[in-house]
């Protein structure tokens, strides 16, 4: 659980804030003995992280742009727990090209918006050691399967539609590892 969502014991569960309170992290880490800490700085699970009302429209692309992550909260947590591994749940970027492919081939993902990659790059350069992006892989897989079924409606062999899905997910993860998450070339370290 993110610390803003549910803390240890029923007396410390869910409150109204969507962000982690940096004043609570030392107590939480001490009481739980956790070896990493998922904090809330404006991320959320799924492909619908923000409402259209929370976003503004980029005039150059016509796409919705979400509000920035609360890096001041991340900085305050890092100050309270220097060097402690931080995790970000719900950090999918919701690649618009995958959303567009899904919608082109019969999907109905309206106003699906994620965390901009530049925000994730910034987080990856901090104490954040793990950034969860599962919705991105689901979108990549779904887009490839929908496209295959639309272009080859008689196809029923899973090897024929799961292969392109796997390839699309691999392409996505290579991009994220190399260009976004700062996880490439870590084996030598």
Which stretches of residues belong to each language-model region?
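Single conserved hydrophobic/aromatic residue that forms the stacking wall/gate
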Residues: 1-9, 13-14
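C-terminal alpha-helical cap/extension of soluble enzyme domains
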Residues: 104, 115-189
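Short, well-ordered coil/turn segments that N-cap beta-strands
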Residues: 33-35, 82-85, 129
């Amino acid at each position: 659980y993110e610390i803003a969502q549910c803390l240890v014991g029923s007396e410390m569960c869910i409150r109204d804030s969507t962000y982690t309170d940096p004043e609570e992290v030392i107590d939480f880490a001490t009481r739980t003995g956790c070896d990493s800490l998922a904090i809330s700085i404006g991320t959320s699970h799924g492909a619908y992280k923000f409402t259209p009302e929370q976003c503004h429209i980029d005039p150059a692309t016509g796409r919705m742009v979400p509000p920035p992550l609360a890096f001041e909260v991340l900085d305050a947590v890092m100050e309270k727990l220097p060097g402690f591994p931080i995790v970000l749940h719900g950090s999918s970027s919701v690649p618009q090209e995958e959303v567009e492919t899904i919608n082109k081939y019969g999907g109905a993902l309206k106003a699906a918006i994620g965390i901009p990659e530049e925000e994730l790059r910034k987080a990856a350069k901090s104490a954040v050691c793990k950034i969860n992006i599962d919705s991105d892989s689901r979108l990549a897989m779904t887009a490839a399967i929908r496209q295959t079924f639309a272009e080859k409606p008689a196809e029923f062999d899973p090897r024929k539609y799961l292969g392109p899905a796997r390839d699309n997910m691999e392409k996505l993860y290579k991009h994220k590892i190399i260009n976004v998450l700062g996880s490439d070339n870590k084996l030598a370290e």
